[in-house]
Design a protein with these regions (language model features):
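Primarily a LysM-type cell-wall glycan-binding module
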Residues: 420-453, 475
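Surface-exposed amphipathic alpha-helical segments
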Residues: 128, 306-310, 393-430
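Surface-exposed aromatic
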Residues: 93, 101, 111-112, 327, ...
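Signature of long, low-cysteine stretches enriched in small and polar/charged residues
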Residues: 328, 345-394
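Extracellular LysM carbohydrate-binding repeats and other cell-envelope/extracellular binding modules
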Residues: 454-482
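A Zn2+-metalloprotease active-site environment signal
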Residues: 2-6, 17-295, 304, 309, ...
Length: 482
């Protein structure tokens, strides 16, 4: 598999990564919510932001429109800007239509937050903690500074490659340059945390919300992880400090404003603005419902067995069952008379095991399976043709092919067409804010959640509740419902 297998192996290596803030330079039209300026920033920053903004918006699913949430954002940003050291800056805030929890900034005052991250916030102070961190990146010119450091590192690597004849010396020079970039990025994150907490505290928000929300993000990373591990080893090449380091530094900065619990909360009024927020996948990209994937436009569905966890992306549907086992599902156009077995034998699979192709069916649809080996990886591949589309299921495991053989068979057996009635009934998930009534418990409220097979975990995550926390009558909580 010239492209698919290396990509899948790379995805396994990156499965534990999560960014909460990046100086973005990635890929339309956008009309961001604006905070009225007194003075524009430098033209250089403005040009960079204007150039990169359309690519960022396109990469993250476009702009998500929600007047209630936009009003809440403008209110929070206005207070933060007024409390910053440069209240004359102009900021443009965009909600991105992405289910992934992320926020970042571009030079020129472009601030971005995904609807996936908004779903995790539980009061305006937590939202302020996110936005003040990104405002700090803008004020400190972090994106431009980091670009210069990366450029210098690239020069070092090129010199090492062109001038040094000793491979060990070349590798040492490259490693030193990468460590320099990583340490610089970590320092930027710590500085943005410190500046952001100072801004939020001066604006009257709870300064301890930053450490609280960092904990929520760590729980979010755990929830998304197939292994459920929160004990990721710290890499000296990581661009962010560890969550524990950031929480400790955030608490230290917050204590300058006093003790925790002295800032009035606004949970109930804030959650009212999130009522109706789309949660999870965009309808145009299909839906993940627990271990099931459904695409109303393509009229297909399939499910994966335990313990696989599905993730929908623009390029493919991915699943993982631990650090060394994964699945990728995608589709490619083919002539309508192409058989799945001929397609598997057409040369796109590197390491195809001779004689391993087997013809079969998937609920009446023509299908075929095959085996492949690449290095120390085992692969089981399935192909199903629906009209002029060939859908591919690629399972990979680093130790054995027995488990993935069974997983492929089960997934292939679940693949079928959706009827027009099935497709019409599919609706996106939304955040619904409800009042806790007498007799309600965490367990009873979580049981009402839809679209997930991990209801209790997701309910606690969305509402910022620990394992021992309870709910009280009169408070508001978030549910995920169709």
């Amino acid at each position: 598999m010239r492209r698919i297998l290396p990509i899948l192996v790379l995805a396994l290596g990156l499965s534990g990564c999560q960014m909460t803030s990046v100086p973005a330079t990635v890929p339309a039209r956008v009309e961001p919510v604006a905070v009225t300026p007194k003075r524009l920033p430098s033209r250089v920053e403005e040009v960079i932001g204007e150039r990169e903004n359309p690519r960022v918006v396109a990469e993250f699913g476009g702009v998500y429109r929600n007047p209630q949430v936009e009003a809440a954002l403008v209110k929070v940003v206005s207070r933060l800007v007024a409390a910053s050291d440069d209240p004359s800056r102009h900021y443009k805030v965009t909600i991105l239509n992405s289910p992934v929890a992320n926020a970042f900034a571009l030079p020129g005052g472009y601030l971005y937050i995904t609807r996936g991250l908004l779903a995790l916030t539980n009061d305006s102070s937590e939202l302020a903690a996110v936005l003040s961190h990104e405002i700090a990146h803008v004020i400190a010119n972090h994106a431009v500074a980091r670009a210069r450091v990366i450029e210098q590192a690239d020069i070092v690597e090129k010199v090492a490659s062109d001038v040094l004849s000793d491979p060990v010396a070349q590798q040492s020079a490259r490693l030193r340059s990468r460590v320099t970039v990583a340490r610089f990025s970590q320092d930027q994150e710590v500085e943005a945390d410190r500046i952001g907490i100072m801004i939020a505290g001066r604006a009257g928000f709870d300064p301890f919300a930053a450490s609280r929300f960092l904990d929520s993000l760590e729980h979010y990373a755990e929830f998304r992880s197939a292994t459920g591990s929160r004990d990721e080893p710290k890499s000296f090449l990581a661009s962010h400090p560890t969550a524990l380091e950031r929480r400790e530094l955030a608490l230290r900065a917050a204590r300058q404003f006093g003790a925790p619990g002295t800032t009035p909360g606004d949970r109930n009024s804030y959650l009212a603005a999130l009522d109706g927020l789309v949660y999870g996948d965009d309808p145009g990209e299909g839906f993940v419902r627990g271990r099931e994937y459904l695409h109303p436009r393509l009229s297909i569905r399939f499910s994966v067995p335990e313990p696989y966890r599905l993730e929908n992306t623009k390029e493919a549907v991915l699943a993982a069952a631990g650090p060394n086992t994964a699945m990728r599902f995608d589709g490619v156009p083919v002539p309508a008379d192409t058989s799945p077995s001929d397609y598997l034998a057409s040369g796109w699979v590197n390491g195809l095991v001779d004689g391993s192709i087997r013809e079969t069916t998937a609920n009446g649809l023509p299908a075929a399976t095959a085996e492949a080996r690449a290095g120390d990886w085992f692969f089981r591949i399935g192909a199903v043709r629906v009209g002029s589309s060939m859908y591919r299921m690629i399972f990979a495991d680093r130790s054995s092919d027995e488990a993935i053989a069974a997983a492929l068979d089960e997934t292939l057996a679940s693949f079928r067409r959706l009827t027009p009635q099935d497709s019409a009934r599919l609706r996106p998930l939304t955040i619904e804010v409800v009042d806790v009534k007498p007799g309600d418990t965490v367990a009873s409220l979580a049981a009402r959640m839809q679209g997930t097979d991990r209801r209790l975990e997701l309910f606690r995550l969305l509402n910022g509740l620990g394992e021992q926390d309870v709910v009280s009558p009169g408070e508001k909580v978030k549910l995920v419902l169709e």
